[in-house]
């Protein structure tokens, strides 16, 4: 860990005026009169919240997460028994066997059946348990994927937001440089009219003024483009009112740059890309257990009940007398008679059939896989390949994160060193310019020397401004890797 202390808080722009003055200058230029730059202000958090809510790519990713949640619900439901019920009503024609009488019939018969069945798996090689654990891991992996995409969006929005802040400050710098040159032009003209300076000095300052006006136009265009880029990232209508809030973006007097190893160790526990890759390793391991479970016998408990009705089901309804009926002869050929009768049959009542045909069944079933054309073996081999792929993907993600943190650490340290150097350079050029301007007003230096001094100062101010925002952004990236979010 490296701790750096600053004794004095540097000011980037020694000639920077009050914010109210800058606002009035920009208002006069018409910048804030356009629909893009109105009175409505958005903070960085407002922009991030809006992007996370309305980003289409993120919404698509959330569909994957929602789909994984439904699969997880199904995993819990797989432990419940199945319950089915069915009813049928129909007619049979021609020769058929009635299921309730077991007799052949050639007449049209109306039949009805009602049946309910249930089944529950008692053992299947722990497939339901493993499938549940697999979907828990899958749901977790998709959630981390969503967080990873959210992080990418936050970084993109943060970078675009800071680009707008930088562009606004750059416009202020250009405005101030233009104001300095305008004031110097007035003094130069006065000195020329007083005979102290030649006309060439006035022309040199006027040329410098035209150059600064061009710089201001370029700065305003860059600001407009920065706003447009941010608006496009937020999927807003460019015609709507939009302006950002200006947070305090000063460099701290005392700050700490953690070593890259410490940041990396913390990032391993908070970065969703790492946790997603790790979840997929566990998913692949659980998939192998699932596939191996297909080799196990499946023991199920089954229950069934039902009843039915048939028009072919008849019952005895009485007898019909036929009078004396000869049934044979005695030895002496005397005929033998008895009272004849016919049995009267009727269709068995519906309620009685439903009651009498009611049946129940409870039993166990065991299915033992013997030969399945190497299907299970092939599944297991595929799952092992997926496990190796997931492990390599984790290592790749881990290495990429380590490289990114190492690079971010080096960038942050270099950005601070550059910022320190530009501040020192700015202080020196600022003092040199004031000294040159005093000598120029006395006619002791030429307009060429004055313009060169002012050009060096303007360049130093721009470099200091760029170094400031570059350093702040690099530090925010380091904080983001440690799970501290992106805040200004």
List each model region and its residues.
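Terminal intrinsically disordered/low-complexity segments used for targeting and assembly
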Residues: 1-50, 220-265, 311, 315-319, ...
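Bacterial Sec-pathway N-terminal export signals of envelope proteins
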Residues: 38-88, 94, 238, 244-289, ...
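Sec/SRP-type N-terminal targeting helices
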Residues: 59-63, 76-77, 108, 122-150, ...
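Short segments within alpha-helical structural elements
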Residues: 63, 75-77, 211-236, 419, ...
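Small/polar, glycine/serine/threonine/aspartate-rich low-complexity segments that form flexible
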Residues: 86-120, 247-255, 289, 302-368, ...
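Transmembrane beta-barrel architecture of outer-membrane proteins
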Residues: 111-115, 159, 204, 211, ...
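Membrane-embedded beta-strand positions in outer-membrane beta-barrel channels/transporters
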Residues: 115-117, 161, 264, 363-365, ...
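Periplasmic alpha-helical coiled-coil/stalk elements that build and connect Gram-negative outer-membrane
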Residues: 152-266, 411, 415, 435, ...
């Amino acid at each position: 860990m490296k701790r750096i202390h600053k004794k004095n808080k540097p000011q980037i722009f020694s000639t920077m005026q009050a914010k109210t003055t800058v606002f009035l200058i920009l208002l006069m230029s018409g910048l804030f009169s356009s629909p893009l730059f109105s009175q409505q202000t958005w903070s960085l958090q407002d922009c991030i919240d809006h992007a996370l809510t309305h980003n289409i790519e993120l919404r698509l990713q959330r569909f994957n997460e929602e789909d994984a949640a439904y699969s997880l619900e199904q995993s819990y439901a797989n432990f419940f028994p199945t319950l089915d019920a069915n009813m049928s009503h129909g007619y049979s024609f021609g020769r058929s066997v009635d299921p309730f009488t077991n007799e052949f019939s050639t007449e049209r018969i109306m039949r009805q059946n009602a049946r309910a069945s249930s089944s529950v798996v008692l053992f299947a090689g722990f497939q339901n348990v493993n499938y549940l654990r697999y979907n828990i891991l899958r749901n977790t992996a998709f959630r981390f994927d969503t967080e990873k995409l959210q992080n990418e969006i936050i970084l993109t929005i943060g970078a675009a937001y800071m680009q707008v802040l930088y562009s606004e400050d750059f416009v202020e710098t250009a405005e101030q440089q233009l104001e300095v040159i305008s004031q110097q032009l007035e003094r130069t003209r006065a000195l020329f009219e007083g005979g102290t300076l030649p006309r060439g000095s006035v022309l040199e300052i006027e040329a410098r003024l035209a150059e600064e006006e061009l710089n201001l136009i370029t700065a305003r265009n860059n600001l407009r483009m920065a706003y447009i880029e941010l608006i496009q990232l937020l999927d807003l209508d460019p015609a709507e009112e939009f302006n950002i809030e200006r947070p305090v973006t000063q460099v701290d007097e005392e700050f700490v740059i953690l070593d890259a190893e410490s940041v990396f160790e913390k990032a391993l526990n908070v970065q969703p890309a790492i946790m997603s890759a790790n979840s997929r390793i566990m998913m692949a391991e659980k998939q192998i257990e699932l596939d191996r479970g297909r080799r196990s016998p499946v023991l199920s408990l089954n229950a069934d009940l039902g009843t039915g009705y048939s028009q072919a089901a008849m019952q005895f309804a009485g007898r019909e007398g036929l009078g004396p009926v000869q049934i044979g002869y005695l030895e002496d050929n005397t005929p033998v008679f008895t009272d004849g009768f016919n049995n009267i049959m009727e269709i068995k009542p519906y309620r009685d059939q439903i009651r009498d045909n009611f049946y129940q069944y409870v039993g166990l079933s065991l299915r033992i896989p013997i030969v399945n054309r190497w299907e299970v073996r092939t599944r297991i081999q595929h799952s092992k390949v997926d496990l190796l792929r997931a492990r390599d993907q984790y290592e790749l993600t881990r290495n990429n994160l380590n490289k990114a943190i190492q690079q971010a650490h080096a960038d942050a340290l270099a950005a601070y060193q550059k910022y320190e150097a530009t501040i020192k350079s700015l202080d020196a050029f600022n003092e040199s310019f004031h000294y040159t301007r005093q000598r120029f007003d006395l006619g002791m230096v030429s307009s060429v020397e004055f313009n060169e001094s002012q050009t060096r100062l303007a360049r130093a101010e721009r470099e200091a401004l760029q170094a400031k925002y570059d350093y702040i952004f690099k530090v925010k990236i380091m904080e983001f890797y440690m799970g501290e979010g992106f805040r200004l």
